[in-house]
Each structure stands twice: as C-alpha cells, then as structure tokens.
Amino acid sequence: MAQLSGQPVVILPEGTQRYVGRDAQRLNILAARIIAETVRTTLGPKGMDKMLVDSLGDIVVTNDGATILDKIDLQHPAAKMMVEVAKTQDKEAGDGTTTAVVIAGELLRKAEELLDQNIHPSIIIKGYALAAEKAQEILEEIAIKVNPDDEETLLRIAMTSITGKNAESHKELLAKLAVDAVKQVAEKKDGKYVVDLDNIKFEKKAGEGVEESELVRGVVIDKEVVHPRMPKRVEGAKIALINEALEVKKTETDAKINITSPDQLMSFLEQEEKMLKDMVDHIAQTGANVVFVQKGIDDLAQHYLAKYGIMAVRRVKKSDMEKLAKATGAKIVTNVKDLTPEDLGYAEIVEERKLAGENMIFVEGCKNPKAVTILIRGGTEHVIDEVERALEDAVKVVKDVMEDGAVLPAGGAPEIELAISVDEYAKQVGGKEALAIENFADALKIIPKTLAENAGLDTVEILVKVISEHKNKGLGIGIDVFAGEPADMLERGIIAPLRVTKQAIKSARAAIMILRIDDVIAAKVSKPEGRQGAECPPNGCMGGMDMRM
C-alpha cells in the first residue's frame, strides 16, 4: 500500500510481503549464509557427513555438497541462488561444490560488515568484481603445467578428490578405475584432449565388496537374452544395433480385412510369418550373431533368431545403444532392410552373466572402445551410491586435468596465495573499493580455516602458522589435516585441477547478484495441508516462504 495526496493506493494483493533496502539485503544474506553454514562442516578430508531423510523415509548419508543441496527442500529464493552456485560448479568443474558455496557465503558475510559501515552496495559490488578478476589472473600465473598423459599426476588428482569421502578406504582402486576410464574415452582434437563423460557408464549392483568393482572396456547392460534357446555367450561377436521393433508394423490407417474362410486366415498368418522371417533372414545374411534392439521383438522373430543361433536383447535404452555404437564401432540402423555387414560392430565376447541374482549383458573386448563401463559393487545400496558419487567426482577432475593440463596445490594453498596477493592489490586500487577488495581477500581464508576447524585443529594458531610459512616457503604450503600442520602440498602429491578453483572463485558472481537486490516482493504462498516449515529466522520469513530444509 502506498499513499498519494493522502489517499491510500493498494498496489499489491493482501498477504504479500515486501522488504526494501537494507532489510531485503540482510534477509537475502542471512538465507545464503544459512546454506553455506549447512555444508561448511562437510569440507575437506575430515569433514562430517549429513543424513538426509525424504518424505518417504528414504535415507541418504553423504558429505558431497552437490548431493546435499540437491536433496534439501528449499523455499527462500536467495537460498536457491546458492544451490545454483553448487550446480554450476558441479557442471563446469565436477568438484569443489562445497568450496564454492562456502566462499560465496563468506563473501556475503564480509559484505554485510561493510554495509554496517555504511559502504554503499555499488562500491562493494565494484570492489568484489575487481578482486575476482584479479584472482583469476593470479590463478593463471601460479598454475602448474602438467603432462595430460602423466598417469601418476592423474592418479594423484583422482585420489585427492576421493579423500574425505565415504569411499576413501578404496581410493587407490577407485582412482585407477577413474583414470583408466577417462583415458580410454579421451579423444585428441587439434592436439588437445576432449573428454565426453557421457561415454562413461556407471552400472551399480549391490553385493560383494567395493574391491570387486571393475572397469569393463565395453558396455554392461542391465538386460537379459530374450529367448531361452539363444546362446548365452558369443565369441567374436558381430553386433547389429537396430532402433526399430522386430515386429510386423501396424498400418497408420484403420484398415479392416474381412476373412471368410480358414484358408484366408492361414494365408494372412503365413504372410505375417514370412515378413518376420525375411527380417531375421536379412540380419543373418549380414553375418550378425548378436542383435541389440531398442524396441520390442516379436515372439516369432525370437524363434527364428534362436534357430540361427543369434543372441538378441530387446528394449535397450537409447543411451546404451549410443554407448554400444561408440564401443563396438557399430552403426545404429533405423530399418532392418538397410542393415549391411559394414554396419556391424565387433566385440571379442558378448555374454549374459548373473550378478546379485540378476542377469546382465557384458559386451567386452572391443577394439579401442570409446565408451566404457565402471561396474560398481558394494555391500549395500548406500555404499554403492557413495562409491558412485566419489567416482563421478574423480572422473570429472581427471577430465579437467587432461583437457587443461594445469593443476594447483590443494589443502587451502591457492586460497592463501590469493588472499595474500589480492590484499596487496587492494593497496594499489585505493579508495573505498579497496575496503571491498580487502574483505574479498579475507573471505578466501575461510577455506583453510574451515579445513583446520573440521580437523579439530586450533584454527587461529594453524592459520597464522600456515600463512607465515606460505609467505616464506612458497605457494605450495597448505594445511595437511592428517598431520595437523602446514606442509608442501606439491611434495605430498595433494593437488587439484586449476579449473575447480577458478570456477569456485566465480561464485563471487552469486554474492554480487544477491547484493544487487534491494527490493523483495513475495506473494503469499499457500502451504499444503499438514506440512510444517522450519521456524523462521529472527529477521522473519519472506511472504510465506519458509526456510524449509
């Protein structure tokens, strides 16, 4: 409601809440910081886990920042913006989601301190933008170039990523699986590696131990052979990929046939049978002995395929068909009549095997396959889910290094270097923007501070010590949380991709976006019956938008 010439003017519907200026900024900063604090305790090798229980009672126990934020039910728009930070980090770099969110939350906390000193948001925004740009330049300067073909470096990168996750006890095996998988699907274009992670499939089966997980240089499909008389194992497989049904096609128009005698019925059925037999005959003539079909296979077609000794699998997912094409060199055909011997792929073995009481098809021994499968085993569903999350992060960071050929020391070392260098840069800029740049630099110390805090170390003592040694001994000095002391991360093989840290610093954009908001208009949201939200923060909730998690 507003007033003009003493007359009240109703603009917004009843129940709408509006927050303007400092109130809007504080409320948004509070919501974003709550998200950052939620995941902060999971950061680093000594980070804690979160137990997430959904409305159906299903439980997820993890310390993966992206998974936690994806599973939390959020209502506050500023909180959702922080989730977008994590999603972008995961998509662009594959790791460092918690780091990105924690940095964004700390930048907002430091911005609030400046707001309390009556520094205008525009000045803070400009200072943060200058600092973020400078930080990116510094990261490029301090990055260590590595050989993308150096397996030892790739293994160290993968192990650093897995360290601290629930699958850590098998990090050597999992790192090896991740590196081998990425190297197998990597392709060189214009002298640089390009890795399409869609060509790495994760297939999970509960049972056995994690140590039984393996890399299949081909494709594993959760299907079974369609007919009991078909072979269960084919060596020297010539593989046909068909994305149409091996069935008699129905006409597009509703036609009716009047059958007046048994002979006509027999003739009709014989024609159907001939059409199906012709399809199978054509497949056999091409030399194919294994057929994967994206759609259905008629019972009669199954019978004829079995007579020819051809293994057939039906209703294969489109994504699996594409991986089979990449692995075996086969071409996917849309019409059986168009199938030629040149369209067939090759694998040394195609076999149906029983795993955890279920049949699965293994396509192995492909010639230089550009699609592979990591078969994940583990005692329970929770275990294999955590192993899958660890492997997903590991393959992404290995991809980063193979494509960029650049790494940084981990253990908070790059953030300490940035904090020192950006603080020096603030002195060159001067003016009120320098205050924002100094606060930006100070905010970056939240990463080494949190690593120490989560390891149960004295944060003040270790932070002073590590910054001092970093200045004296070089940019490799970070915090070894296992030894509880400053150490050279490069010497200890604790490294991370340049891309992860660069993308995490870009989280400053989210902080800038939130600081730009000075007016929030929130419509009243009707809450479903029987659903209770968490209590509002001291500053209140936004127009029916609770802080549910």
UniProtKB/Swiss-Prot annotation:
Record keywords, A-Z: ATP-binding, Chaperone, Nucleotide-binding
Pfam families in alphabetical order: Cpn60_TCP1
Cross-referenced InterPro entries: Chaperone_TCP-1, Chaperonin_TCP-1_CS, Cpn60/GroEL/TCP-1, GroEL-like_apical_dom_sf, GROEL-like_equatorial_sf, TCP-1-like_intermed_sf, TCP-1_chaperonin, thermosome_alpha
GO terms assigned for molecular function: ATP binding; ATP hydrolysis activity; ATP-dependent protein folding chaperone; unfolded protein binding
Stretch list, region Disordered: 529-549
Coiled coil location: none
Signal peptide from the UniProt entry: none
Protein family membership: Belongs to the TCP-1 chaperonin family.
Subunit record text: Forms a Heterooligomeric complex of two stacked eight-membered rings.
Function, as annotated: Molecular chaperone; binds unfolded polypeptides in vitro, and has a weak ATPase activity.
UniProt protein name: Thermosome subunit alpha
